[in-house]
Every structure is written in C-alpha cells, then in structure tokens.
C-alpha cells in the first residue's frame, strides 16, 4: 500500500526537530495549509497571530506507473515563511532549507528520497514579507 499522502507529517517533523529552525520559530507556529486561529483559554478571545510563522502544503503528487504497478510518486511541497521583518524572513527561510534540503526518510511507512529545493521567490503583502520555497522529492 502506498502512503505518499502521509509525507506532510514527516515534512513537519523535519522542521520542528531542527534546532536552527526551532530557535527562530516555535513549533506551534508551523501550520499545514493555513494559519489556525487560537482562542485564549482564559478569555475565549482570539489570540493575536505573531511573526514569524510557517505554512506548508503539498502542491502536487504525481504517480509513476509501469505496466504492472506503481513505482513511485513525485511530490511537491510549498513552504511559505511569513514575517514582518525582511532579515528575519531570510534567516527563517535559510533554516527551513537546512531542515529539509537533502533529507531522506526511510521507515516502515515511507521511503522519502532526498528532498530537493526547486526554487525560492520573495513577495510582499502589505507589511508582510513572504519567502515562498518549493521542494520536491520522490517516494517509493
């Protein structure tokens, strides 16, 4: 059975377990797909979202088949570093790169081949800086 769709759990683990990145971004500020609003346990009010934070998502999964069976999947992930400070956004993006690039995972569920950084682009939205990083890897 193929478990490629579970790769996001391992992407998250690689980021939260990286010491360089954990100094810059708390593990509860690394989000799959979107930022999760949190409520203050005492007041029940929404807590303010603070910078920096990271959003990651799978952008594609392309299976490769032969006549007989599935041989591997090529997965692409986008990791977006969000900050209100340009230098900080660069430091966090660099730490994300160190956490993911070249890493491979082999266990009973998945065989993730070394992760490759495909591209990085910068953009702004109002007073917010985004470092958009595209990663790809094969799972077989």
Question: What residue spans do the PLM features occupy?
Answer:
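A generic structural micro-feature
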Residues: 46-50, 69-73, 111, 125-131
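Extracellular/virion structural assembly segments
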Residues: 70, 84-101
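Acidic-leaning, charged glycine-interspersed low-complexity segments
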Residues: 98-140
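Residues in well-ordered beta-strands of folded domains
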Residues: 31-33, 55-57, 80, 118, ...
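Oligomerization/assembly interface segments of phage tail-like spikes and tubes
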Residues: 70-85, 129-140
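Small/polar-rich, solvent-exposed N-terminal microdomains that initiate assembly or binding
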Residues: 1-60, 64-67, 87
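Hydrophobic aliphatic residue packing
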Residues: 54-55, 79, 92-96
């Amino acid at each position: 059975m193929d478990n490629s769709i579970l790769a996001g759990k391992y992407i998250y683990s690689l980021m939260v377990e990286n010491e360089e990145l954990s100094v810059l971004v708390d593990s509860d500020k690394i989000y799959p797909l979107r930022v999760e609003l949190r409520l203050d346990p005492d007041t029940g009010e929404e807590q303010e979202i603070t910078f920096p934070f990271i959003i990651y998502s799978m952008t594609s999964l392309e299976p490769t088949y032969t006549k007989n069976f599935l041989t591997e999947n090529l997965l692409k992930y986008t990791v977006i570093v969000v900050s209100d400070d340009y230098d900080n956004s660069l430091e966090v993006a660099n730490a994300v790169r160190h956490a993911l690039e070249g890493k491979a995972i082999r266990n009973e569920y998945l065989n993730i081949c070394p992760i490759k950084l495909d591209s990085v682009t910068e953009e702004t939205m109002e007073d917010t800086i985004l470092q958009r990083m595209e990663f790809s890897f094969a799972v077989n």
